[in-house]
């Protein structure tokens, strides 16, 4: 993946500097590494700004809620997924007329689909099951949004969507929705502070990948 490729590039650069330990080579490769660092910092700064400014875009019309899936462990939501579900529970209680798509397929190490896990969690908390629709085929953020929108059209639900996911994930989700010509808003779930750095760095690579490919 793109994270591994970036790591290989940095490692290769360090190896070349050490191997060609002559003044000229050292100067050339030092400039290469410096240029790489400057570009990397520019990318990180831009992505950080975009993430921070797209965390919450409050709906201005009736929408369908779309909750993006995350890892399931032993048929239970992971911490990140639980954060999304708790925000969903709060938002659905505050807006009792809204319908909700729970989007997420079943990963290789998951006993049930992410959609089913989310459904069970919200129903156990008291959400009316008739308000919940399961989209259980998606394997990526793009598929989450695309397949959810297809289900929305099939069920004749409001076409504008409110995406609920963790704050670090909202910008990429909103970008994908725009590319699919789907009008979208954002309600972000809080991320535990000890998880945020890891997810944040990984998300930056995800954003770069999204714009390149």
Features from the language model and the residues they span:
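Membrane-embedded alpha-helical segments of integral membrane proteins
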Residues: 1-21
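Hydrophobic alpha-helical transmembrane segments
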Residues: 3-5, 29-36
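Hydrophobic membrane-insertion alpha-helices, especially the h-region
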Residues: 33-45
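Membrane-interface helix-boundary motifs at transmembrane edges
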Residues: 20-32
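Membrane-interacting alpha-helical segments
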Residues: 198-205, 209-212
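Structural signature of transmembrane alpha-helix termini at the membrane-water interface
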Residues: 16-19, 23, 42-52, 208-212
């Amino acid at each position: 993946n793109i994270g591994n490729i970036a790591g290989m590039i940095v490692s290769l650069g360090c190896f070349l500097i050490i191997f060609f330990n002559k003044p000229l080579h050292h100067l050339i490769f030092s400039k290469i590494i410096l240029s790489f660092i400057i570009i990397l910092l520019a990318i990180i700064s831009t992505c950080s700004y975009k993430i921070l400014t797209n965390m919450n875009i409050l709906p201005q019309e009736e929408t369908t809620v779309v909750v993006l899936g995350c890892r399931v462990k032993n048929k239970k939501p992971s911490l990140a997924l639980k954060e999304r579900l708790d925000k969903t529970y709060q938002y659905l209680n505050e807006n009792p007329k809204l319908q909700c798509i729970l989007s997420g397929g079943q990963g290789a190490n998951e006993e049930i689909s992410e959609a089913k896990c989310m459904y069970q969690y919200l129903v156990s908390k008291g959400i009316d099951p008739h308000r919940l629709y399961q989209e259980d085929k998606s394997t990526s953020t793009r598929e989450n949004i695309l397949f959810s929108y297809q289900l929305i059209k099939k069920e004749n639900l409001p076409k504008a969507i409110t995406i609920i996911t963790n704050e670090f994930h909202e910008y990429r989700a909103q970008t994908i929705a725009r590319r699919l010509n789907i009008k979208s808003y954002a309600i972000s779930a809080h991320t535990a502070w000890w998880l945020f750095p890891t997810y944040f760095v990984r998300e930056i690579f995800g954003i770069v990948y999204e714009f390149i490919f």
